Amino acid sequence: MVSKRVESLLNQLRTQGIVDERVLEAIALVPREKFVDEAFEHKAWENTALPIGQGQTISQPYMVARMTELLTLTPESRVLEIGTGSGYQTAILAHLVHHVCSVERIKSLQWQARRRLKQLDLHNVSTRHGDGWQGWQARAPFDAIIVTAAPPEIPTALLAQLDDDGVLVLPVGEEHQFLKRIRRRGNEFIIDTVEAVRFVPLVKGELA
């Protein structure tokens, strides 16, 4: 039995076009309040992005659901997340697939996310402190790659780490950003523009 706050959010997401019941179930199962600072706990189930420190944010639940839905995951999907952040998106993915790989450039965020995931008994996640622009070559190829910060252009390393028929979902742009869904067909990449978005930038090279 879900609470009224959770049910209200799920209804909002359905109204906004989220139809994948597995994604909605994962949203309901992951306690978002565990991924935000105490000062923002009362807003945890609102459909809004919230700050998590280090100039980063926990994405709006709609955007988490939308991007996850666009990945068209199966339990067997090999998934790479770029930008672990709070670990919230990671937790959603961990409820949907057997294993998740996640890269975070800010060490303190990586450790906090690992602690939260462990507290929730989500042990099917591998995290790495590294440059998201480079992906995770040692674990490639991936069926699905999701990027939770916006590069000015699509990182070529991520395209290279997509398996055939794999999907990359990411925001792209600087001042004006658009959510893109890219599917690999052999050596070709089919790019669809989904909607206008606003994300923090995907910082290149610089680890913190």
Swiss-Prot record:
Family matches, as InterPro entries: PCMT, SAM-dependent_MTases_sf
Principal EC category: transferase
Main subcellular localisation: cytoplasm
Keyword Transit peptide listed: no
GO cellular component, one term: cytoplasm
Domain of life: Bacteria
Biological-process GO terms, alphabetical: methylation; protein modification process; protein repair
Compartment annotation: Cytoplasm
Active-site positions on this chain: S59
The keyword Ligase is assigned to this record: no
Coiled-coil spans in chain: none
E.C. no: 2.1.1.77
Keywords carried by this UniProt record: Cytoplasm, Methyltransferase, S-adenosyl-L-methionine, Transferase
A single GO molecular function term of this UniProt record: protein-L-isoaspartate (D-aspartate) O-methyltransferase activity
Catalytic reaction annotation: [protein]-L-isoaspartate + S-adenosyl-L-methionine = [protein]-L-isoaspartate alpha-methyl ester + S-adenosyl-L-homocysteine
HAMAP family (UniProt xref): PIMT
Role description: Catalyzes the methyl esterification of L-isoaspartyl residues in peptides and proteins that result from spontaneous decomposition of normal L-aspartyl and L-asparaginyl residues. It plays a role in the repair and/or degradation of damaged proteins.
NCBIfam families: pimt (TIGR00080), PRK00312.1 (NF001453)
Protein family per UniProt: Belongs to the methyltransferase superfamily. L-isoaspartyl/D-aspartyl protein methyltransferase family.
Annotated protein name in UniProt: Protein-L-isoaspartate O-methyltransferase
Organism (species): Klebsiella pneumoniae subsp. pneumoniae (strain ATCC 700721 / MGH 78578)
Organism lineage string: Bacteria, Pseudomonadati, Pseudomonadota, Gammaproteobacteria, Enterobacterales
